[in-house]
Each structure stands twice: as structure tokens, then as C-alpha cells.
Amino acid sequence: MNEENSLLTGAVRPALLRYALPIILSMVATQFYAVADTMIIGLRLDADALAAVSNASTVLMIFLFVSGGMELGGGLLVAAGKPTATKHEMTELLYNLLFVDEIIALLTTAVGFVTLPALLRLINTPAEILDTAVLYGRIYLMGLPFLMPYDLSKECVMGCGDSKTPLKVIVATSVMNIVLDLVLVGPFGVAGAAAATAAAQVAGAVYMVAFLRRTQMDAAFSPRMLKTRYARDIFRLSAPNSVQQASGTIITTVS
């Protein structure tokens, strides 16, 4: 049976388990990477470096929730449209999602670059680690234009009923990130850790967007495919979630 249609036919429980288990394992793999990343930085560098990464990561969460909102909105649109949309309609939807996502990613990166030092001061980052935290954060933000389409593509593929491919890619990029951490953190410090993460995001984005293009689209991109009605739907579903998550993080961080 075609995996992307298996949730719509046959017994519900086995199909749901086959779909949900890879998602759970994806979350486990992501958490394992986060722990491994912290351990490598803690073992290879000093306490100040680890504190700088921790402070930068707290601020970066504000920008990452923008990505999370786009993921949720994109996944909902794809899952809602998949059962009835034609291949060409799905192609248009996916291109519009990726286009809007990339524009938002570039804008978010620019805002992050400018506001990062002020946001770090706002959370009382110690002066002695401020420059290191800014360095880590800005290198990490350079990967955001790849992280956002990577995350969105994973969510769109899952919205089409395939949760195994995103799991495989998450495991592969996590392993790549850890290996690059081991290679780069020692000689380059927190900059190496951020560069390792950005490189893994680039690799994940390239693979997932190519996979989405190969399996779910029937035409090359054309500017004529961009339509305002898709943009309205994207913002309608994505913006409230992004604002809700980001505002909660801002309030918790500042307080």
C-alpha cells in the first residue's frame, strides 16, 4: 500500500502506530543530539563558552518559534489539501509555502543579526561572555534560511503521510552535526559548534526540498504559481502559533 495513503484506508490503529512511531523517534533523536551537543561543548571548552551558548540559545528560541509557526501552518495546509487536491494544486501550494517561508527566514535572520546583542543584554548576559554569545548566535542565524525550509519540508512530507523519511534525515543530520562538533569545536570554539549546526541544516534542507520536489510536485517553479490566496492561508494558520510561542518565551525570558 502506498505509505502516504495508508492512513486513509484499512485498520486505523496499526496505520496510526506506523505513522506516529517515526515522529516519536524523531523527537528522541533531536533531544539526543541536543544533549550530545551540550556535552561536547562542555567537555571541549570552558564554563564561559557553555554559558555563552546557553544564553544565545535562549534568545534564538524567539526566532525559532517563527520557524515552528511556519511548520505548523504548512503541515496543516498540506494535510488538509492532500486528499482532494490535484498534483498541480499541491505543487502550487508547496512552492508558495517554500517561497513565503524563505522570505520570512531571510527577514528573521536580518532582524536577529541586528537585535541579538540588545536581546542578550536584556536577559542580563554577563559582559565577559556577551561577545562569544553574539558570535555563536549570529553564525547560527546564518543557517536559519536553510533551517526553516528544512523544517517546513519535513512537516509537509509528514502532512502527505510519510513520517519515515523525515526520521531518516533527522538521524543523518544529527549524526553529521555531532561529527562536525567533534571536529570543529576544539579548534574553533563556539563558532565551530554553530558552524556545525548550520552545515547540518544546509544538508538537511537540500535533501528534504529535493525529496519534496521529486515526490510531491509535477512542475518546475514559475513565478506565476505565486498567489495571494495561498499567502493569506499561510499567515492565517502560521502567524497566531508563532506569536503565541514567541511571546510566551519572551515573557518567561525577560521575567
Spans of model-derived segments:
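Alpha-helical transmembrane segments of multi-pass membrane proteins
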Residues: A127-Y150
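Transmembrane helical elements of multi-pass membrane transporters/channels
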Residues: R18-D37, I139, T173, A200-G204, ...
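Membrane-embedded alpha-helical segments of multi-pass transporters/permeases
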Residues: V35, M39, V66, L106-P117, ...
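Membrane-interface helix-loop junctions in multi-pass transport and translocation proteins
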Residues: S174-V206
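Interhelical loop/hinge segments that connect adjacent transmembrane helices in multipass membrane
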Residues: M1-A20, T197, V209-T249
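Helix-terminus/linker motif at the lipid-water interface of multi-pass membrane proteins
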Residues: F32-A51, L120-A127, V183-F188, A246-S255
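Interfacial/gating helices of multi-pass transporter permease domains
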Residues: I41-M61, A127-T132, A191, A195, ...
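Small-residue-rich hydrophobic transmembrane alpha-helices
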Residues: L50-A110, L147-P166
